[in-house]
Amino acid sequence: MKTTRILTLCLMALVGLTGLTTERAAAQKKEKVILDTDMVEVFDDGVAMMMLAKAPNIDLLGVTIVIGNTWVPEGTAYGIRQLECVNRTDIPIVPGIRQPIYPNRFETIKNERILFGIGDAYVGAAGYPEPASWRAVYLQKYGREPSTEPLDMKAVNFIIDRVKANPGEVTILAIGTCVNLATAVRIAPEIVPLIKRVIYMGGSFFRPGNTTPTAEFNWWLDPEAAKICVRTPFKEQVIVGLDVCEKMAFRKDRYERITNLVRNEGIKGMMKRNYLNVKFLEEPTYTHYVWDVIAASILIDPTLIREEVKRYVDVNSQFGFSYGQALAFDSNQPVGSQPARIILTVDEPRLWSMIEKYCSEF
């Protein structure tokens, strides 16, 4: 009897230790992520960030802001406010590089589009003046004082430091222009083998571009930075481009459903005043896409990927008709180009379910 009790107690202790070990292992398995983004309110960079902040399997180390959809001061303000709304002010927002690599890039855009043609009239931050400061944007937009501030550090240094502190563990999710990451690997090339993987939202390999007939917006705005990145010998590169993103339409009924799911009044207000809501009200048949959210979703759950190809990739940085075009090579690739996984199809019903689930937690 005594022996049986001792054995029982030993087994209970062993089970308890196993449970603790399992919990610790689960915590250790969290994917460490740096989100590098040209932040906007809600769709789609904002939703991508908030999903990562809520995902139980993601450890979002920080959000680095880059030029692109918005100016860096704007992106900084939007990032801070949205993390406040989802109670994740522990995640640092880190302002990054304010201009593309090419000198006077924004000044060339008007003539470039006259000479080479356009797809979409949208040019992001290139279409209006840079705000004075992130705080000015925040106060003007939200009419209140922020509860936190951006990290007093440059985004490039943040990327370098966090990668070195977590060798082989950090995934970079680059959903804006690539100038922060490109600069980081040029300044500190020793971090390249230490990065677990890079996932990009950018490029269009097997279909037309959106900003020009050949180029997707993120890589068109800073082709030089995109080229540096995709030619860097990272352990793994995954590209979520227009090839997959523009198969997944975002329409008025779904936008309204998601708006109704959101609980936080701050986020709900952003959804209601967002340009997309205005566009859907003016043009109910309008179709939009959720580019960056797809990239974040396949990071959270890679089983969402249904079809992909592996190719050597490059970016055309020659100023001309195909400036910023993403290029894929099955063989006979240019010297220096690197292999990448190009995502072509995702499980759309499951992905929408995931988006709606996370939005209901905002």
Label for each model-derived stretch:
Residues 84-87, 98, 360:
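Generic short alpha-helical segment signal, independent of protein family or function
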